[in-house]
Amino acid sequence: MKHSKKTYDSFQDELEDYIKVQKARGLEPKTCFRKMRGDYLETCGYKGEVNSRPTYRMFDQRLPPETIQTYPRSCTISQTVENRLPQWLPAHDSRLRLDSLSYCQFTRDCFSEKPVPLNFDQQEYICGSHGVEPRVYKHFSDNSTSTHQASHKQIHQKRKRHPEEGREKSEEEWSKHKRKKSCKEIDLDKHKSIQRKKTEVEIETVHVSTEKLKNRKEKKGRDVVSKKEERKRTKKKKEQGQERTEEEMLWDQSILGF
């Protein structure tokens, strides 16, 4: 037959019921609370004790009692964390909240600043490691010296190579300069030849034009002279023709009687 889960009005009622059940079974509930729990319960209005998890008890048994210390500062931190948690959580959540706070308190107490006593094997291991340190230091120093020598050698080789590289660079630059100069000279020669041709063509055109002008002038002069001569000839011919006609007329009159 399944038992229905009881509902509790508060965490205190649930805790009291749990303690009663444990006592009825003949078991004594283990409780491990610190001052922080009591202060918290008093402030919240709860009374009684809360069972701690058995895992924490197991950790307490494993570690020596010298390592566990109480820190009042941790108590205040846990209280501030508890106060920041929301109040609307149910009773089960509040129980988990208290358990998580007790676990934080426990871990804080366990990992204290007090050193744990070492056993014989650990001491032997530490002594052996101290013996190894000089050899490791020697190995590192040898490596550093070898790297320093190698770097010095590389620098020396670079310096040796540097003048040769400088010479090669200067030769390359000189050849480039020569090439540029030759290209410039070729361009200048081409430009000069083009200019020369242009000037020659211009001179020829001027010469031809002047010759043409001269020829035209000469032609014009000849034409004028020839025209004048022709006019003179025509005049002479006319005059001669007129004289003949008069003679002929006189002849005709005398002989023919006209």
UniProtKB/Swiss-Prot annotation:
This is Lysine-rich coiled-coil protein 1. Residues 211-248 form a coiled coil. Residues 162-175, 183-213, 220-232 have a biased composition (Basic and acidic residues). Residues 142-258 are annotated as: Disordered. Residues 150-161 have a biased composition (Basic residues). Keywords: Coiled coil. The keyword Zinc-finger does not apply.
